[in-house]
A protein has these predicted regions:
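Long, contiguous N-terminal structural blocks used for assembly/anchoring
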Residues: 1-108
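Metal-dependent nucleotidyltransferase catalytic core
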Residues: 105-117
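Acidic, proline/glycine-rich low-complexity IDRs
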Residues: 114-153
Length: 153
């Protein structure tokens, strides 16, 4: 994740916390968020080396659906605002829910606690782009793709 993205998400999460307003969702490209050398991001309590397993899982999905787009939904700050945390992947894919579940349940050690189809988009949701800009998810969706969530606890 680059410094522009870090600055944007820090500002957004701190502002939401200060205002007690948690209505917006923020996403990052999985490549930006799961960078194995970036200790600013934590996914399912895996700050550095553990991210490789999630990347391999995602790449397996992308090999089966070349049109898939995978995002990480950020939910908070930890360690005196020095780390952003997440435990949910958002998947745009042409694959069925059964196929997504099969892919994510293949590894025995990191499978998610819950996988389902995301149908409620009533909360404002934004992708934090490469330049720190906010992109509405309405600009990301394609009619031929379903949207799924994969949540780890």
């Amino acid at each position: 994740m680059n410094n522009l993205q870090k600055g944007t998400i820090l500002t957004l999460l701190k502002t939401d916390k200060m205002n007690g307003n948690y209505t917006n969702n923020y996403w990052f490209s999985y490549k930006d968020y799961l960078n194995p050398i970036d200790d600013f991001t934590d996914f399912c309590c895996e700050c550095l080396e553990g991210k490789h397993e999630y990347i391999a899982l995602i790449e397996n999905l992308i090999n089966k659906d070349k049109t898939a787009k995978i995002f990480v939904q950020v939910y908070g700050l930890e360690d005196n605002d020095s780390v952003i945390t997440a435990d949910t992947l958002i998947v745009f894919s042409q694959l069925s829910l059964a196929e997504i579940k099969h892919i994510f349940h293949e590894p025995k050690d990191i499978f998610p606690d819950d996988i389902g189809e995301q149908t409620d988009f009533s909360q404002p949701t934004f992708l934090v782009g490469d330049n720190g800009e906010l992109i509405s998810i309405t600009e990301l969706s394609h009619g031929e793709q379903s949207v799924y969530y994969c949540w780890w606890d």
